[in-house]
């Protein structure tokens, strides 16, 4: 009996190890479109720290976005000063890693930061991490100290979520889009992807207009409209592919 129990324990341990490996492989093999469908806002995170490998991968993604879009985004790890005490007490938990969305002030900066933040959030999702885009409720003074002379529009909390989050309430495609003539499949796919994008207060106050292969996106002019447009553009591109051009 002792041998059978030992063998059973070994087999159980092996099965557990295989499941862990399988989960890791699934996360690493997730493509951006899958990440887009699975990503939801998470406001409570576990105490599990980011590994050195995860930090390296996230910083590589930050560097690529900074170089491509002339930004000054940075990743802060193990820093709990980004949120005010009241928010941490009642609304959020475990926010200690975050991207600072920053750059030199210029026309189009907010949109570029929104676009880059979408890339960072979905990349983090492919690594098995969760995110939360925070615009108006972070401790601006504490965060801005890390990037003197730069404009900061928000932060993106990143880490291991206590839950995977839930899908936000969404408008219908007809409420946020219009197309001149019969709607091509690529446009419909792009709009559906855009509806998965996180926007300020989840209001989805954007409009996508298409004619031929030209597409434009407008917003209602709120404080975060520039960032929202960038985030929505990223998602639309992911859904529509290369069948169109921005007007």
Predicted regions and their residues:
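Acidic, surface-exposed loops and disordered segments
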Residues: 1-247
